[in-house]
């Protein structure tokens, strides 16, 4: 299926292609995915999911990471659910009862509004140095990611993404790395703000506990991160793509 770039978290800002193609995994691809997915390697997991998208459309290499993170979720969602709905069940942290909700891609998945000004980057002061920020595409990000994939000095994906926001990593790699990793006080606040601006573009989904509401009248809810929903393809397929009696007719 083709997704117009205007419907991505970036709004398609600066893209010279109108859409990207994302395909649901078929049966043999799901089996291969579950066999080959590097379960104990955080960096390997991210690279594996990224390569799955690139197989669908080479233009993914020119997409912003903020869009690619969403597309990783979208590919998994369209694999487990034909109508892009999803059954969520979490335990209420207050009463311990399960909270169940069917979320819809159209009505429940929302992006934080993008401001075109931030897409042009900014000048920042970090660790006593002045940097220009960029909005990294996959091609930009891989220049940074491949360094850490090789040497494994930093393995936290969010930290690597933060480092990738700085322009000229190829010229100032050690300085940028040190200024990000050793940030304190206001510099930490700055880096967290940059993460939210350039990566955390999906709104969380609030699930209201009806049991708590019924018992004391208070409205208690749990915030669920969209990206963390799909963890097991076959389990999620059973729940979100059930069959009825017409699918199997015994002789």
Q: Could you tell me what each predicted segment is?
A:
Residues 1-251:
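Long C-terminal interaction/binding lobes of large macromolecular proteins
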């Amino acid at each position: 299926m083709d997704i117009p770039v205007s419907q991505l978290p970036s709004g398609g800002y600066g893209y010279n292609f109108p859409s990207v193609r994302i395909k649901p995994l078929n049966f043999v691809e799901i089996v291969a995915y579950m066999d080959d997915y590097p379960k104990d390697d955080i960096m390997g997991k991210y690279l594996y999911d990224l390569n799955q998208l690139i197989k669908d459309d080479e233009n993914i290499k020119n997409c912003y990471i903020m869009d690619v993170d969403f597309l990783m979720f979208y590919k998994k969602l369209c694999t487990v659910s034909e109508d892009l709905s999803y059954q969520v069940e979490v335990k209420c942290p207050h009463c311990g009862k399960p909270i169940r909700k069917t979320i819809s891609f159209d009505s429940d998945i929302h992006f934080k509004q993008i401001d075109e000004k931030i897409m042009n980057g900014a000048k920042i002061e970090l660790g006593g140095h002045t940097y220009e920020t960029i909005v990294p595409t996959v091609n930009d990000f891989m220049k940074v990611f491949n360094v850490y994939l090789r040497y494994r000095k930093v393995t936290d994906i969010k930290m690597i993404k933060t480092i990738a926001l700085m322009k000229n990593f190829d010229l100032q790699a050690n300085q940028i790395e040190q200024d990000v990793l050793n940030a304190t006080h206001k510099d930490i606040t700055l880096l967290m703000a940059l993460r939210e601006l350039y990566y955390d573009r999906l709104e969380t989904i609030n699930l209201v506990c009806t049991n708590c509401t019924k018992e004391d009248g208070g409205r208690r809810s749990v915030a669920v991160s969209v990206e963390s929903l799909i963890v097991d393809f076959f389990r999620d397929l059973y729940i979100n793509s059930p069959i009825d009696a017409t699918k199997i007719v015994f002789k």
